[in-house]
Amino acid sequence: MTISAVTGGTVITPGGPARADLLIDGGTIAAIGDEGGTIAANEDHGGPGGQRLDASGCYVLPGGVDPHCHLMPGVHPATAAAARGGTTTVLSFTGPAAGESDLDALLRNRGELERGGAVTDIGLHAAIYDPERIGYDELATVKRAGAAAIKIFLAYPELGIMCSTRRLYELMRAARGLGLLVQVHCENAPLIEALVEEGLHAETRPASAGGGADRELFHPGARIFADTRPPEVEEEAVARTLAAASLAGADCYLVHLSSAGSVEQVRLARRRGQRGVFAEVCTHHLLLDNTRYAGADAERYLVCPPLRDRSDVEALWEGLADGTIDTVGSDHCQVKSATTGPLAEAGHCYTYGLAGAGPRLPLLLSAAAARGLPIERVARVAAENPARAFGHYPAKGALAPGSDADIVIFDPDGEAVLPGDGFGDGTGDSVYAGLATRGRIRAVLLRGQLIVSDGVLTDDRRPGRYLPAAGGAA
């Protein structure tokens, strides 16, 4: 169904909330006018067959932009779930096959996306699993392929993907010259290895690592996992990444920050005048804490970095409120990787995230309202800032003339309970199942097409497109 006008709602524009009507033409926003003015009065809303969508009593938000997903291969289930949850643009990391180079994975994944299959629009980040073998020429091809960013891992030596500090600096220098943003997974792998080898348990854990929860109640495997990836291993790697970026004169994007100390590192860097620092948190670190590791189902919540103490959760929300945190991603992982067996028991985890592409925006809107966080701040961290960081603004992440008509109609007085299947994301399990949310997403538009109505997909054509970042190939 083509929508050519959205009327009667409170529109969250780049300048703030406004009672206004939107005119849509050719999949983009043609005009924003005063509520009840000429847009609402005009019966010819932008073209034949277009219908008016009444948003009375609702907020009209830009479609969500999820900056952090692991979807490849097979994007349909997760993008369908994302759409049902109000996300219209998903940015996914590449997924190399066995023996495939990082560059070949990007080009193959791009080809898959260009053939269609996604419900939302979707862009790519180039994950670098072989940092020693990728050079300037390959990075230039990454840029031309439409990726706005590469991702470096300071962890996972057991998988052979860890990047040294020297190589991180060298890649940052190269990326700077190409206009590529460098994303970094910040954990100090040698420290993790030492803690794993020691078999550190709760009774010997240093107090400085944080211990607000009663760790004696933790499931043994989860306790070992959390104790061998304490906040210090993240915070040290954050400081090291910020130093490397400063010396390289490069922009950096810190993925899934989870601790109070990491948030403070970002504040300190900005106070020193360091520019081009982007800080991300993920839904699970905002909504869940490490008391989940006390349950019989503790393994469901194993994620890197692990869930933290309640004090860390509060610090993340403070960073979200004061602008230290720029973006909120889901870190959606389409396949629950190995979290059992000898390696998991030794403290290793290969789950990059938790299934959450669908619940991300409903959870964030609900929790933010409960904390008194303005809805325009939610729109900024869930849509505008991710679009800006990765070269998709203002086509995405904004409700303004010329922007894509990616729109969410959100009823703040509605209520919903999150489904157990994660909005049908294909994983068959959601750690957010049964959580009640304040507010309800009534409708979702992608480029002016109604794709979700009251939680139900209305368009089975899989209309999503591959989305190259600005400066990449069209």
Predicted region positions:
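Divalent metal-coordination and catalytic microenvironments
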Residues: G9, L22, G27, G57, ...
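Alpha-helical scaffold segments that flank or form the walls of functional sites
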Residues: M72-L124, Y129-A148, T165-G177, E236
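His/Asp/Glu-enriched, well-ordered alpha-helical/loop segment
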Residues: R223-G249, R300, A321, D326-V328, ...
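N-terminal metal-binding scaffold of metallo-dependent hydrolase/deaminase domains
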Residues: M1-N42
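C-terminal cap of metal-dependent C-N hydrolases
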Residues: P342-A346, P401-L467
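Histidine/acidic residue-rich metal-binding segments in metalloenzymes
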Residues: I134-V328
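Short, small/polar residue-rich loop motifs at catalytic or cofactor-binding pockets
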Residues: G16-A18, G47, T437-G439
